Structure formats: structure tokens, C-alpha cells
Amino acid sequence: MLDFSLHGEKGKKEDKIQGLTPKERKVRFSENHTGQAVEERIKEYDMKKTDKAIEMVKYAIKCGVRFDYLLIDSWFTNAAFVKRITSRHIKCNPVGMIKLGKTRYQTPYGELTAKEIIRKLHKLGLCKHNATLKCTYCTIDVKYAVTTVRLFFCKRGRNGQWNGLLTTDMKLSFLKAYKVYSMRWATE
């Protein structure tokens, strides 16, 4: 294993931050860990997850690990993260699931959400069927986070749910993107 991080969140109950009473929280870090690795782990516990993910990518590169694609979950596939990865001297392309929410992408058809893009591409007859994966898919290049990205949308079966993938590799085909991202599912 190269690196890992453990993060805490405040939670929803204000009287039990992180699910702990004030007494339990106080006892948790009672020893002095100055100058030890434990001190670093305590600091990163409250650190923003996207910031830590960037640090981990930099650390992997520093350790000599080379990779073409950075596989990311939909939680990390946001404008700030994509912008950071593409603006750095990190020579890799993120491939990540996207949420089909309210995020708007600049398309040739105007600013549209993922669901609106799917409807538009379906209406224009730009969705294709992939016999290998037995799914319907469509591809579009859009502007997102001040950079051009390629979006792939796919669904299995007639009543299947649409899923979205985002990448900055403009040469990537749908089949290759699916196979690359499926490596992430295999490791989970």
C-alpha cells in the first residue's frame, strides 16, 4: 500500500460531534504525539478530502508511480477537483463518475445539466448501442471547470438508470473509458 487517509466528519447531531460526547472527544487525543506520524494523521483527520486526494496523487508521483488515468468517485468529480488536476503538472487524465444533478455543462446546445444532455442526445439520435457491454451510450465533448472534457452516458436495458463518466482524455472511446473505470469497481 502506498498511502491512505482516514477522515472524520462532524455529523448531524450538534451535541455529539462525530458521534462522540465532549468527554469522549477530549480523551481521544490525550497523549502528546509531537514529532510522530500520529500527529500528521490527526491533522489530516479534519482535512478536506479533495485536498488530501491531491496530496496523495502528488505523493504517488514523487514515489515514482506513473499512471495515465486517475480513477475518481462521483464525490470527487467536481469542478474544483478537475480544475486542480488539469492545472497542475500532473500528467494524467481523471476518469470519474458524475452525478446527474444540477451541474451545468457548456455544450454546443447551450448550458445543460447531465439529464438535459442525455435527453437532447437521445432526441437527436446520437445514442448508440454497444453489443459488447449490452448497453446504450452517448458521448459529448463539453466545457466544464474552464477545460474541455468528454462526457459518456450509458444505461443497461430499456428501463435502466443512466450513469455518467467524465474524462479529460479527448481521445478516449466509450468502451475504453468503461474498461478503465471498471478497474475502480474491481478494487472496491
Where in the sequence are the language-model features?
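Short amphipathic alpha-helical "interface-anchor" segments enriched in bulky aromatics
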Residues: 176-188
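Short, surface-exposed acidic/glycine-rich loop or hinge patches that mediate macromolecular interfaces
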Residues: 75, 171-172
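Short acidic-hydrophobic catalytic motif
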Residues: 163
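An internal, acidic/charged active-site-proximal segment
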Residues: 17-159
